[in-house]
Design a protein with these regions (language model features):
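Substrate-binding/catalytic cleft of secreted carbohydrate-active enzymes
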Residues: 1-200
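Carbohydrate-binding surfaces of carbohydrate-active enzymes
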Residues: 149-292
Length: 292
């Protein structure tokens, strides 16, 4: 939506703008539409319509050729068409790293990410996970394990969660009068019910109220990280995840609990605001007599 681009421009949110292309059922085999000459112009048109529509938005920093639509030469032509118009932004296309400017993959394991940030694989940099953390059901519980690895380096750009919001409609049960979120077989052909729910993958409900995953994502993605280093000595590490801003506008306080009872509450942590600059870490000692 245009308003989303406006908000990203205003608040400095980086956008990867992706062409509306996905031929998932054909996927990466010989039947992929990316190999079919008759679909070449349609692929290029969709990419260029995207570029023409949003090229003047400063929040758009990456172009994406599409998603899960095959490895054919058509996408080389799409890349060349974009570059002939705009050379100021890198172009990515999931997994097809040899034809674009940056690297990506989908749904890697945590172990793979831990190896990747240590330089164990031959990757094209900058690198990001173009799709991960499928948010269906009770999901995203291991998100912190991905980000402990990702945040250990500055050349791994993170990833894109599948996806933002559950896609369902408010519907009324004629028998009870109660409303519910309808999806899949609730609109089945010839009134044939099924449990297909592959549209319910979001971290938000259809009415944009948060699900449990939302709060996990918010915590993991927060701009300031805090990690225990040696709690017997009261030592913690503060990581300023921002790339441009120091912590001067943050109020950092700490509380200490013993067996669930608060013994120190909202104590200011002096010095951290002025010391921790962008992408810097600092170790601080909480002033408390732990021997007592």
């Amino acid at each position: 939506a245009p308003y989303w681009y406006y908000l990203c421009d205003k608040y400095g949110i980086y956008l990867e703008d992706e062409a509306n292309i996905e031929s998932h059922e054909y996927y990466y085999g010989k039947q992929s539409l990316s190999h079919v000459p008759e679909f070449r112009n349609a692929h290029i048109a969709r990419n260029m319509e995207m570029v023409h529509a949003t090229v003047n938005h400063p929040s758009v920093v990456i172009w994406s050729l599409g998603n899960e639509a095959g490895p054919g030469k058509t996408f080389v032509d799409c890349y060349n068409a974009i570059k002939a118009y705009d050379t100021s932004r890198p172009v990515q296309y999931e997994r097809n790293n040899d034809i674009v400017d940056m690297g990506s993959n989908q749904y890697p394991s945590i172990a793979w990410v831990q190896g990747a940030v240590q330089g164990k694989y031959k990757l094209k940099y900058p690198f990001h996970i173009s799709e991960y953390a499928h948010s269906m059901g009770n999901a995203c519980g291991n998100l912190i394990d991905y980000w402990d690895a990702i945040e250990s380096t500055n050349f791994f750009m993170g990833g894109a969660i599948w996806d933002w919001v559950d896609q369902a409609l408010d519907k009324q049960d004629p028998a009870t009068g109660k409303t519910y979120w309808a999806y899949g077989g609730d609109f089945g052909k010839d009134n044939k019910p099924n449990d297909g729910m592959f549209c319910m993958n979001g971290i938000m409900r259809p009415d944009l109220t948060p699900k449990a995953q939302y709060f996990e994502v918010k915590k993991v993605y927060q701009n300031v990280g805090v990690k225990a280093i040696d709690m017997k000595q009261g030592q913690i590490e503060i990581f300023n995840k921002n790339y441009f801003e120091p912590l001067k506008n943050y109020q950092i306080v700490w509380s200490l609990y013993k067996d669930g009872v608060c013994v120190k509450k909202n104590q200011p942590l002096q010095g951290a605001k002025n010391i921790v600059g962008p992408r810097e870490k600092g170790i601080y000692t909480l002033p408390y007599d732990y021997a007592s």
